Swiss-Prot record:
One of its GO terms (cellular component) is peptidoglycan-based cell wall. Pfam families: UPF0047. Gene3D superfamilies: YjbQ-like. This is UPF0047 protein Rv2556c. Belongs to the UPF0047 family. It comes from Mycobacterium tuberculosis (strain ATCC 25618 / H37Rv). PANTHER family: UNCHARACTERIZED PROTEIN YJBQ-RELATED, UPF0047 PROTEIN C4A8.02C.
Amino acid sequence: MDTDVLDVDTARRRIVDLTDAVRAFCTAHDDGLCNVFVPHATAGVAIIETGAGSDEDLVDTLVRLLPRDDRYRHAHGSYGHGADHLLPAFVAPSVTVPVSGGQPLLGTWQSIVLVDLNQDNPRRSVRLSFVEG
């Protein structure tokens, strides 16, 4: 298994498009599976359309589902931080994409994005792993 780790700045963005980095990683391979994993308890990875408002809609929906207030038992960190720890239940910490001829088999409008509503951590690691097959 080949692996690489991306260092991602999330200080000013809640949705970070990882698609170009994933494509670049996959070009060194032929056929197999690429896993994109974020090893953090308050972030996730999704496949969505970006640039047409869907990314903002996702953030708005998550903010409505997980309001930042004092209702959470997990109460350390900034106000409402407990909501951040529930995010991975809604947006999984990984996605796996089939790869053929070194290209991720994404649909025309699909992008791989890091989702991070937690403003306490301005940097995130994203692990890319490739399994030949």
